Amino acid sequence: MEHSLYPVPPRFTVRRLVLMDLAAICTLYGACGRDAAWGTRETLAALFGEGEWWGGFLGGELVVCCACVPARSATPQAAALRGALAPARLPARFLLPPAATPEGRAFAGRFLSLLGERLWPPCASPEKRLAAAVPVKTGGLLLDGFFEAGFTLFLVRPLAALRPHYLLTPPGLRQPAPGTPNEDAVRRVHIPLADTLAVSRLLEQGFCGTALYEGADGQPALRLERPNPA
């Protein structure tokens, strides 16, 4: 019998979580520091009654997870997100800040893409509009996964304990006009990701964050885009 010289990589799967997964969820959030201080065992358990928990498993181990709740949910997390958005921009649901192991961060894009097939398909109707939140201080490694899955960054706002969060929307909900714009139709700006104030100001001016890349200094930089006036 012939054997491969290379180990088979562990399989990555996504499924809806149940209350029996609570201990693993708590472990992930417990390792996220102050940005996840809101994630007490009681709070995380309560979210099972308010919405849905989803997780990504690598070789059977939970490595990334997040909760999706209705925007009108009574949870403090949903209330904080509602307060950060104007009524006209309020979506139907919120994807609360995720938690992941170092291995799970590398699978964040795949996790969100698979999750999107279930929760925000490309032809999503208005009642399926969604906004996701990612903490600025510790979420940078996850942010790349959101961009990989097609999300767009549109705001930076203080949320839990006044800590700033990125707010993003998934693909299919902010579609550009048909056709490929020429270079003159879109203005592009590149800003160090660490310059949160500059990023926030550009987002307020109508720019959207679309990608992360490594800058000349080796630090993460954010690409922002805005259509030029016709």
How should each PLM-predicted stretch be described?
Residues M1-L17, P121-A230:
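Terminal substrate-recognition subdomain of acyl/acetyltransferases
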